[in-house]
Amino acid sequence: MEGNGSVDMFSEVLENQFLQAAKLVENHLDSEIQKLDQIGEDELELLKEKRLAALRKAQQQKQEWLSKGHGEYREIGSERDFFQEVKESEKVVCHFYRDTTFRCKILDRHLAILAKKHLETKFLKLNVEKAPFLCERLRIKVIPTLALLRDGKTQDYVVGFTDLGNTDDFTTETLEWRLGCSDVINYSGNLMEPPFQSQKKFGTNFTKLEKKTIRGKKYDSDSDDD
């Protein structure tokens, strides 16, 4: 009987806690409803106008990005094209690739997906054979390399797959996280944790290259397939 008494007392405590929680929720809802009731027609109309203005601004920004070639992963044909494209957009990701490097095709697939998702960033690809001067200027020596640019200046590089877990099977989300770490996309996840991967596997240091002239024009492949 003593056991039944303990159970009854425990049930009563739980019931009281539940009632208290329900009361808090009810009070919060009453408070929000009261706030809405106190908003006059003029204030409500002002809120609607602000919301509509924000929506119009967002739509205009989207159209501007699309007019500049955002929203798709595109190939450019020359160094001159590169400088023009970078000049037009605040955020740019450019894949320096070579046709014979297998890992470039892996990056192509992921970048095509991210280009559609992140309209705020322009996604490009450029064949290194068509851009010898630019590759020297940016120290592009390993293929594939992603140059990450903001306001016309190179912010960072993703060289090979080192920052992506040293695996060909990295996810699109992992590349998205890496680009977010360099602030070239609007990333909404947790930058402290690479998605779906072990933090230890990635480490914390990213490969960054300085803007210096290199001696040779030979490109090293990060892929086993040439």
UniProtKB/Swiss-Prot annotation:
Thioredoxin domain sequence ranges: 75-180
Tissue specificity field: Expressed in testis, liver, heart, kidney, brain, spleen and lung.
Subcellular location: Cytoplasm; Nucleus; Cytoplasm, Cytoskeleton, Microtubule organizing center, Centrosome; Midbody
Keyword Nucleus: yes
Role, per record: Significantly diminishes the chaperonin TCP1 complex ATPase activity, thus negatively impacts protein folding, including that of actin or tubulin.
InterPro entries linked: Thioredoxin-like_sf (IPR036249), Thioredoxin_domain (IPR013766)
CDD domains, per the entry: Phd_like_TxnDC9
Transmembrane as UniProt keyword: no
PTM-bearing positions, type Phosphoserine: 188, 221, 223
Record lineage: Eukaryota, Metazoa, Chordata, Craniata, Vertebrata
The protein's name in its UniProt record: Thioredoxin domain-containing protein 9
Keywords: Cytoplasm, Cytoskeleton, Nucleus, Phosphoprotein
GO cellular component: centrosome; cytoplasm; cytosol; midbody; nucleus
Oligomer and partners: Forms ternary complexes with the chaperonin TCP1 complex, spanning the cylindrical chaperonin cavity and contacting at least 2 subunits.
